[in-house]
Regions:
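RNase H-like DDE/DDD metal-dependent nuclease/strand-transfer catalytic core used by mobile genetic elements
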Residues: 2-102, 106-108, 112, 203-210, ...
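C-terminal, beta-rich DNA-binding module of retroviral/retroelements integrases
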Residues: 115-219
């Protein structure tokens, strides 16, 4: 949690997309949903070279904004970097674990100490558990139907991850196969925006059809 530094979840499993999403589901069930999630650019989180990831779609399906740190700028995630540093100094550098089960047990014990017993100067010498506030957004693990605002073109993504708009065949991502996206003119310049649910996911040049960026933002 950004404001309180409370460690909501430590998942000690092989780092795959399904494990990551399941870990977030468990965290959301227990602590509620945030308005946004900041992550690094690991392949399970960000799909810059190959469209979009299932993790990004999972967040957007639950009205959570995916945010990625700038590449090669770890200071964007300064708090989590310090968290990792503390974990290494206090636990990982001094222990060899027989397997993931042993590692998980040790990490959960360390997490409890970090949250409940360790004061932080930035928190007025309080512990993260003393200042953390549970989110009121309940996670139901159910994707609610979404109705796009009328007046703009809505197109279904084909089985290769492409959509045809005007005279352009545009690649979005296999992640959105059989999903519907909406095209809107950009009021600020000669381009159009591609929206998934209530998020802008890409911008294309209206003249050339060239993608300008694939940056997710709220509509």
């Amino acid at each position: 949690d950004d404001s309180s530094r409370y460690s909501i979840k430590i998942a000690c499993f092989p780092n795959t997309k399904n494990v990551v999403i399941n870990a977030f589901k468990q965290a959301f069930y227990e602590f509620g949903m945030p308005s946004s999630v900041l992550s690094d650019n690991g392949s399970q989180f960000a799909g810059f070279k190959h469209g979009f990831t299932m993790f990004e779609k999972f967040l957007m399906n639950n009205d959570i904004l995916p945010i990625h740190c700038r590449i090669k700028h770890p200071q964007t995630q300064g708090k989590i970097e310090r968290f990792h540093g503390s974990m290494k100094r206090e636990l990982l550098n001094h222990n060899l674990f027989k397997n993931l089960d042993y590692a998980d047990k040790a990490l959960q014990e360390w997490r409890t100490k970090y949250n409940c017993l360790r004061p932080h100067e930035a928190l007025g010498n309080k512990c993260p558990a003393d200042v953390y506030t549970h989110s009121e957004r309940i996670f139901a693990d159910k994707v609610e139907p979404f109705e796009y605002e009328p007046g703009f073109k809505v197109i279904k993504v084909n089985s290769w991850g492409y959509v045809r708009f005007q005279n352009f065949q545009l690649y979005l991502s296999e992640t959105f196969i059989n999903d519907y996206v909406q095209f809107r003119p950009n009021p600020n310049n000669d381009s159009f925006l591609v929206c998934y649910r209530n998020f802008v996911i890409a911008e294309y040049d209206s003249s050339s059809g060239k993608r300008i960026h694939r940056k997710i933002s709220r509509l």
